[in-house]
Regions:
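Compositionally biased intrinsically disordered regions enriched in polar/charged residues
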Residues: 1-3
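A domain-level signal for the structural core that forms small-molecule/cofactor-binding pockets
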Residues: 5-276
């Protein structure tokens, strides 16, 4: 494994093309694009190096933002995630070594580096690496079309992008039916896809509302999230009963008091009957 992922000369040799951070780094913007005056590395330059470096190069080249809460699935191909897990496993081995944890003789730490890598890529941050779930829309234009409010309760698992601590909670998604309807399970799938990445609860509520509006063409959408945060429970203030609530209201949910009241009345009813 060490040999396979040995540092590539592109990044460590003065005789080869070099990665130029001031042209391709975090300060790259549309106002300062990469120019042909700089010798740009092609994809073949990365064939023997780290795949993660190649993907990062392409995103910087395209001025594609790749923050902890951004989806980057357009830059991944079949088999890429497994190779990225291999590379992250190697990096986690270094982290464990720096923490002075004996990975060789401690039976509980053997394989931990790979378990961490798989957990990040396949579970906690899977929403970054997977395309948005398919949400087939059906026309809502028959004579007896539904024009009322729909409220869906979705359980969420997310991760705080500051300390990489778990966030667990519930989202209540309200929508006034428009011209398109999606399956009930799709609301939860979309919400969970938005949640499984590094994010803030305030951003997550906005993300869910935006994706629901896009999938349904609805303009009247409400999202209410209540969650507990590991960064408050496991560190810092150690507040084990801490609860955070965020609300995003679009269209009539924001401008019409009766719609807003109906939404929160529905939430209260669901909370009263929800499993405990």
């Amino acid at each position: 494994l060490k040999k396979e992922f040995a540092p590539h000369p592109v990044f460590h040799s003065d005789t080869k093309k070099k990665f130029i951070p001031d042209r391709l780094g975090h300060n790259a913007t549309e106002s300062s694009p990469i120019t042909t005056e700089t010798e740009i590395m092609s994809d073949k330059d990365y064939q023997e190096g780290y795949l993660g470096d190649a993907i990062r190069f392409k995103m910087k080249r395209d001025n594609k933002r790749f923050w902890a809460g951004d989806n980057i699935s357009d830059y991944l191909h079949d088999g890429d995630r497994e190779r990225l897990i291999d590379e992250a496993s190697e990096a986690f081995e270094t982290v464990l070594d720096r923490l002075l944890i004996d990975r060789e003789t401690d039976p509980n730490s053997k394989g931990t580096a790979r378990r961490l890598a798989k957990m990040y890529f396949n579970e906690i941050m899977a929403g970054r690496y997977e395309p948005e779930p398919d949400a087939t829309a059906f026309p809502n234009d028959s004579a007896d079309r539904y024009e009322g409010m729909l409220v869906v309760r979705s359980e969420l698992r997310s991760m705080c992008s500051h300390h990489h601590q778990p966030v667990s909670g519930v989202a209540y998604i309200g929508i006034i039916a428009a011209q398109k309807l999606i399956g009930l399970s799709k609301y939860t799938r979309i919400a969970q896809w938005c949640a499984r990445r590094g994010t803030l609860q305030e951003e997550l509520a906005n993300d869910i509302a935006r994706e629901i509006m896009r999938a349904t063409d609805a303009t009247d959408v409400g999202v209410y999230i209540q969650a507990v945060h590991g960064c408050c429970e496991n560190r810092g203030i150690m507040a084990h009963s801490s609860l955070t609530q965020t609300t995003v209201l679009k269209g009539a949910f924001n401008t019409d008091q009766s719609t807003k009241k109906e939404f929160f009345d529905n939430i209260k009813l669901q909370q009263d009957f929800a499993p405990r």
